[in-house]
Regions:
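Primarily a LysM-type cell-wall glycan-binding module
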Residues: 17, 23-51, 69-97
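Surface-exposed loops/turns
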Residues: 15, 37, 64, 85, ...
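Solvent-exposed coil/turn segments that connect beta secondary-structure elements
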Residues: 24-26, 38, 60, 73, ...
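Short acidic beta-strand-loop surface patches of small beta-rich interaction domains
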Residues: 1-9, 56-64, 104-114
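Ser/Thr-rich low-complexity repeats and stalk/linker segments
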Residues: 134-136, 141-233
């Protein structure tokens, strides 16, 4: 929680202020959020561009999703990005493939955050791409990947089946459709971990990892999560 203009009193905080716990990432791709007065699971989900069902699913200790209280710690699917020299919100959004509006909304109201000015060392909360039923926690958006890259996340899927592919920016299928299985099937959320073997060399410097399920009725893609990545040369 680096403090700077317009916040000048480092020892002063106020009710309702949003702070990030120093232990920002307890598990890869999950950041601790401290509930403040007036919060609901839905409002937290909206702020971080995710879904209340998913938040409940990645917080198994949450006995009643309709009842959360100030001071409670919840995991949210997000990473902490430290601004470096030359960064702007636009360049960060473009590099990570995360909409600028999503980044701005997640950080609005934090100490010294301004959508017009950021400086080296400031830490931004970056929501990870997710749908109601899938969150990809590794790799992060903007990661440089190669064949064998680890893929890890959380999903609520029929019979626990999750599928994935990798495309480059020219539409070439770098890693064809493969499946993996979650640790629990729907209606529960389960963890999945697998790798992304390349079937052919990318023809461009960047592309997308797709993670999704297929409809049991017609086989169509559902809950598609698209994650921007770069390819190792």
């Amino acid at each position: 929680n680096r403090l700077g203009p317009p916040v000048t009193e480092h020892g002063m905080i106020f009710p309702g202020q949003l702070l990030v716990i120093p232990r920002v990432v307890t598990q890869r791709g999950r950041t601790i959020y401290v509930v403040k007065p007036g919060d609901t699971l839905y409002s937290i989900a909206v702020r971080y561009s995710t879904h209340a069902d998913l938040l409940a699913g990645i917080n198994p200790g949450l006995q009643n999703p309709s009842l959360i209280y100030p001071g409670q710690q919840l995991l949210i699917p997000a990473l902490i990005y430290e601004v470096t020299s030359g960064d702007s919100l636009y360049s960060i959004a473009n590099r990570l493939g995360v909409p600028l509006t999503v980044i701005t909304q997640a950080n609005q109201g934090r100490p010294a955050f301004s959508s017009n000015l950021i400086w080296p060392g400031y830490r931004l909360i970056i929501p990870l791409p997710s749908t109601q039923n899938i969150a990809v926690l590794d790799p992060y958006p903007g990661t440089v990947i190669r064949s064998g890259q680890r893929l890890h996340g959380t999903a609520r899927a029929f019979e626990g089946n999750v599928l994935h592919q990798v495309f480059d920016s020219n539409g070439v299928v770098v890693s064809g459709e493969r499946s993996t299985t979650t640790s629990a099937g729907a209606p529960s959320y389960g963890e999945f971990t697998t790798t992304l073997p390349f079937d052919r060399e990318p023809t461009s410097s960047f592309g997308n990892v797709w993670v999704y399920t297929r409809s049991a009725k017609d086989g169509s893609m559902q809950d598609v999560v698209r994650l921007k990545v770069y390819f190792s040369r």
